[in-house]
Curated annotation (Swiss-Prot):
<comment type="similarity">
    <text>Belongs to the queuine tRNA-ribosyltransferase family.</text>
</comment>
<feature type="binding site">
    <location>
        <position position="212"/>
    </location>
    <ligand>
        <name>substrate</name>
    </ligand>
</feature>
<dbReference type="GO" id="GO:0008616">
    <property type="term" value="P:queuosine biosynthetic process"/>
</dbReference>
<dbReference type="GO" id="GO:0002099">
    <property type="term" value="P:tRNA wobble guanine modification"/>
</dbReference>
<dbReference type="GO" id="GO:0005829">
    <property type="term" value="C:cytosol"/>
</dbReference>
<dbReference type="Pfam" id="PF01702">
    <property type="entry name" value="TGT"/>
</dbReference>
<feature type="binding site">
    <location>
        <position position="305"/>
    </location>
    <ligand>
        <name>Zn(2+)</name>
    </ligand>
</feature>
<feature type="binding site">
    <location>
        <position position="143"/>
    </location>
    <ligand>
        <name>substrate</name>
    </ligand>
</feature>
<feature type="binding site">
    <location>
        <begin position="89"/>
        <end position="93"/>
    </location>
    <ligand>
        <name>substrate</name>
    </ligand>
</feature>
<feature type="binding site">
    <location>
        <position position="331"/>
    </location>
    <ligand>
        <name>Zn(2+)</name>
    </ligand>
</feature>
<keyword id="KW-0862">Zinc</keyword>
<keyword id="KW-0479">Metal-binding</keyword>
<feature type="binding site">
    <location>
        <position position="302"/>
    </location>
    <ligand>
        <name>Zn(2+)</name>
    </ligand>
</feature>
<comment type="pathway">
    <text>tRNA modification; tRNA-queuosine biosynthesis.</text>
</comment>
<keyword id="KW-0671">Queuosine biosynthesis</keyword>
<dbReference type="InterPro" id="IPR036511">
    <property type="entry name" value="TGT-like_sf"/>
</dbReference>
<dbReference type="InterPro" id="IPR004803">
    <property type="entry name" value="TGT"/>
</dbReference>
Amino acid sequence: MEFTLIKQDGAARRGTVSLAHGDVQTPAFMPVGTYGAVKSLSPVEVRDTGAHILLGNTFHLWLRPGLEVIGEFGGLHRFMGWNGPILTDSGGFQVWSLGDLRKITEEGVRFRSPINGDSCFLTPEESMRIQKVLNSDIVMIFDECTPYPATPADARDSMLLSLRWAARSKAAHQGNPNALFGIIQGGMYEDLRDESLAGLTEIGFDGYAIGGLSVGEPKEDMLRILAHTTPKMPQDKPRYLMGVGTPEDLVAAVSHGVDMFDCVMPTRNARNGWLFTRHGDIKLKNARHRKDTRPLDEHCQCYTCLNFSRAYLHHLHRSGEILGARLNTIHNLHYYQELMLGMRQAIEQGRFEAFATEFRQGRQMLQQSA
């Protein structure tokens, strides 16, 4: 893996991450393909939205269809028909989300499979083995996602466990030519975030992620940790903010120097009839859209906006038609990718601050009427 920093405008960064299956232009947004598919779309449709890289879910793919199946295809790319780069998470967040169904020890995490109830044991070494079979371009270390809220003592214990697991992940990754990213933990405590980052950089990784945010904390806490942590991350490595977020979150994070993002928000909201536009959000369930002949966004060039009205999308949503979820997903992902493209161009032109101001002003236009 190679990271090239092309231009910096303030703290905002424009770069390229060169990976085994292609280049990723940053700032970049990764659509989430939990089970090896971005929900409701084909790989061609996902690429047509402007996506360069996808995220796959190690935990779920390990449980189903399993490594024996994916291994027959030489990895996830051929199995799912996507020839671009793939990042896989380590399974740590999914195990954390099981709550009382899992038991964490120094060695790893024991839990019951949510599919069939089988006893499973996931360790840093096993996570690295799984991700090697998946042949993902970017592998994430196995970590513990610090819960929110957490006392300083609990957050520190969790962070230190993640650091020990990070070292084990690095050792187990030896022999895998793909990139390995470390994950900064530490809850809502700046000093713990600093300690985590220092420990990870001492171990040494190809890129660094900010984990443990967007887990229920107030937005101001998320932004506080983001503003504190990002500037201290290595300048010559990609910076990845995990599981975030709204369009506003993405612009704010890029302003602090984040390069990569993933989030289920554009796809999940699309299936729930919640659409993002440059003028604000549209909720298709609202009756005001029943006879609206306009597209979602008159300036959007996605397939949905070029061919269908708000009235038709409202009808599909109210009728529960699968086509509605597909068209909505195409639009939301296209919107996110166009937002990333706009930020890349603004950084190149040295006008990111003006872009961010125009973005915020535009997004407020529909707040009262959507």
